[in-house]
């Protein structure tokens, strides 16, 4: 016989028993699929509109930049032609004549300009 | 032949076209008609370079400050001219007042 001093207390259910467990299915408030579709579609529509309007503006800007750059193309091409003619060159292609890239060189034809 | 940067040429595009527009159009017409050989359009290309050099010389002499501001703005905007409308307007005013009367 062991002389334990602690008095053992049996673990018993509470008086009156355990309350009932809520195991029934509980669903959230249902959202119709059409509403979800409309919401997502509206968001995508707004984004698409923003994208395309910005794209149109961007393309217009690029066209304007290209037009302004093309205004100086005669100067660049003429300088390139004169620099090419002022340099020793020969036609090294057998298909058609294509001007090779030449570095900056003082043009003899315009030395006194 | 003096060399100018792309920003400088783009900055003064309207001015040089106002003075040398006919020469540029003649050169473009010649290149369109006669092909890529530079010898065939040597007279026109020489005229183009001469005219643009003449205009640029006057611009550098009279409108150096406005040209420098335009060039700085264009170079800071990755060679874009649309964000530099104010500087270009100031340059055009200087060009119309000091450089254009010598040619037009």
Swiss-Prot record, chain A:
It is found in: Mitochondrion inner membrane. Keywords: Electron transport, Membrane, Mitochondrion, Mitochondrion inner membrane, Respiratory chain, Transmembrane, Transmembrane helix, Transport. InterPro entries: GRIM-19 (IPR009346). Its main location: mitochondrion. One of its GO terms (cellular component) is respiratory chain complex I. It comes from the Eukaryota. It holds the Pfam family GRIM-19. It is a single-pass membrane protein. The chain crosses the membrane at residues 31-51. Belongs to the complex I NDUFA13 subunit family. Accessory subunit of the mitochondrial membrane respiratory chain NADH dehydrogenase (Complex I), that is believed not to be involved in catalysis. Complex I functions in the transfer of electrons from NADH to the respiratory chain. The immediate electron acceptor for the enzyme is believed to be ubiquinone. Complex I is composed of about 45 different subunits. PANTHER family: NADH DEHYDROGENASE [UBIQUINONE] 1 ALPHA SUBCOMPLEX SUBUNIT 13, NADH DEHYDROGENASE UBIQUINONE 1 ALPHA SUBCOMPLEX SUBUNIT 13. This is NADH dehydrogenase [ubiquinone] 1 alpha subcomplex subunit 13. It comes from Dictyostelium discoideum. The lineage of its organism: Eukaryota, Amoebozoa, Evosea, Eumycetozoa, Dictyostelia. The gene is ndufa13.
UniProtKB/Swiss-Prot annotation, chain B:
A motif (Cx9C motif 1) lies at residues 20-30. The keyword Transport applies. It is a peripheral membrane protein. One of its GO terms (biological process) is mitochondrial electron transport, NADH to ubiquinone. It is found in: Mitochondrion inner membrane; Mitochondrion intermembrane space. Coiled coil: none annotated. The lineage of its organism: Eukaryota, Amoebozoa, Evosea, Eumycetozoa, Dictyostelia. A motif (Cx9C motif 3) lies at residues 63-73. Complex I is composed of about 45 different subunits. Its main location: mitochondrion. Belongs to the complex I NDUFA8 subunit family. One of its GO terms (cellular component) is mitochondrial inner membrane. Accessory subunit of the mitochondrial membrane respiratory chain NADH dehydrogenase (Complex I), that is believed not to be involved in catalysis. Complex I functions in the transfer of electrons from NADH to the respiratory chain. The immediate electron acceptor for the enzyme is believed to be ubiquinone. Disulfide bonds join 20-51, 30-41, 63-94, 73-84. The keyword Nucleotide-binding does not apply. A motif (Cx9C motif 2) lies at residues 41-51. This is NADH dehydrogenase [ubiquinone] 1 alpha subcomplex subunit 8. Keywords: Disulfide bond, Electron transport, Membrane, Mitochondrion, Mitochondrion inner membrane, Repeat, Respiratory chain, Transport. Signal peptide: none annotated. Residues 17-59, 60-102 form the CHCH domain. A motif (Cx9C motif 4) lies at residues 84-94.
């Amino acid at each position: 016989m062991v002389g334990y001093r602690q008095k053992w207390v049996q673990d018993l259910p509470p008086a009156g028993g355990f309350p009932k467990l809520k195991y029934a299915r509980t669903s959230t408030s249902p959202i119709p699929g059409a509403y979800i579709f409309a919401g997502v579609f509206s968001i995508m529509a707004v984004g698409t509109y923003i994208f395309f309007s910005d794209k149109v503006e961007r393309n217009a800007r690029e066209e304007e930049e290209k037009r302004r750059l093309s205004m100086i193309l005669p100067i660049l091409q003429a300088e390139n032609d004169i620099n090419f003619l002022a340099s020793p060159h020969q036609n090294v292609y057998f298909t058609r004549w294509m001007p090779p890239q030449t570095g900056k060189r003082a043009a003899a034809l315009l030395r006194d300009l | 032949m003096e060399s100018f940067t792309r920003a400088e040429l783009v900055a003064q595009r309207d001015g040089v076209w106002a003075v040398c527009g006919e020469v540029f159009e003649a050169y473009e017409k010649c290149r369109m008609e006669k092909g890529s050989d530079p010898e065939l359009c040597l007279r026109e290309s020489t005229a183009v370079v001469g005219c643009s050099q003449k205009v640029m010389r006057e611009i550098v002499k009279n409108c150096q400050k406005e040209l420098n501001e335009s060039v700085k703005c264009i170079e800071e905007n990755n060679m874009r001219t649309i964000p530099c409308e104010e500087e270009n307007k100031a340059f055009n005013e200087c060009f119309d007042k000091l450089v254009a009367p010598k040619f037009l």
